[in-house]
């Protein structure tokens, strides 16, 4: 992009753009360094040569190119600041205006307005009529607004659309050579296109000219001093309200999914090795030692519990072979059999199905049948340690049948109820102070 074509239209209003000014001595020397060769300038030319000077001196920041550092340059002494930003055009215009003197020369104004009038197309009769009725435009607008609210809303939308076109048209850009320049917009071309459209319909032309005049009067400062960082061309798409939907909102919702297992896994237990796993006889699947079922086919593990029936059979056989018991059972007693078959005083049975207490002879026979269980309990007392036969150390009432398991070991020192309470309250094992993994109801056989 050539430096001479950097400034196509000033960011200043029309009146200030056509106003002739004379820079002071210090500012004039800076403009002459940028290539200026005259004494009187327009504001457009002052901005052009000032941008050319900043480009040649490379006073702009390499990272943030809209910031100009002029503290060690004569430009800083002229403007009275060490740095400024082109994003604040009002402040920049105020700094430059201090070093300018207004020149009132109608001849020079006419010479300046001639090329501008040549560059613009001929004005049609619609524009002439709109200029003649400009004095009564405000009254007509008020009447239209009061009579037709829909047309007033349409005018407001078109006026706001023109505001966006003008405010979006000014931008600051840097080409491949990092040239610093201010690019004007398409306000003049769009104004000409609107005036050419007004020739076809005089009423529409009047309303458009009135809307443009009102927007220029009310928004001259905000529109003419807006700065952006992209260059728009004539063929660029117009602003549409649908583009607002594409802009992401401030509030964004993030959905986070956490994957975790619902059940505890035995694979993480460091105390369980592969040697402890058991193999299913049906599907040949290796399973952890604690579950009793296979994970694949749900088959119960063989030898999961001891065979209690065989023990009972062995104990019953031992009691039958005992000579003392056989003497009791084989002794012929006809009177005992008669009393069993024909009791002397038959006992009735209640309607509720509750049996009447048995006579002493029947109790004697049942006690003879319970003798194997007593012998079995006596054998357990002989083989188990004395601490296992003591009551629970916590409640001192129930037997010790609640094994506190932690890892591959456990302690049998409390009943199942007390041990379960310790587990639910997240207490430690009272013996070894280890975390309680589970509580097992223990049967002594």
Swiss-Prot record:
Record region (ARF-binding): 190-279
Task: Specify the SWIB/MDM2 domain's residue ranges.
Answer: 19-102
Q: Which GO terms describe its cellular component?
A: cytoplasm; nucleolus; nucleoplasm; nucleus
UniProt zinc finger (RanBP2-type) residues: 274-303
What keywords tag this UniProt record? Cytoplasm, Metal-binding, Nucleus, Transferase, Ubl conjugation pathway, Zinc, Zinc-finger
Q: Where is this motif: Nuclear localization signal?
A: 160-166
Among the GO biological process terms of this entry, one is: regulation of protein stability
User: What chemistry does it catalyse, as a reaction equation?
Assistant: S-ubiquitinyl-[E2 ubiquitin-conjugating enzyme]-L-cysteine + [acceptor protein]-L-lysine = [E2 ubiquitin-conjugating enzyme]-L-cysteine + N(6)-ubiquitinyl-[acceptor protein]-L-lysine
Give residue spans, biased composition: Basic and acidic residues: 117-132
The disulfide bridges present are: none
Give, as residue ranges, the zinc fingers classified RING-type: 392-433
Subcellular localization, as worded in the UniProt entry: Nucleus, Nucleoplasm; Cytoplasm; Nucleus, Nucleolus; Nucleus
Known InterPro entries for this protein? Mdm2, MDM2_mRING-HC-C2H2C4, p53_neg-reg_MDM_2/4, SWIB_MDM2_dom_sf, SWIB_MDM2_domain, Znf_RanBP2, Znf_RanBP2_sf, Znf_RING
Task: Please give the name of this protein.
Answer: E3 ubiquitin-protein ligase Mdm2
User: Could you tell me which species this protein originates from?
Assistant: Danio rerio
The uppermost taxa in this organism's lineage are: Eukaryota, Metazoa, Chordata, Craniata, Vertebrata
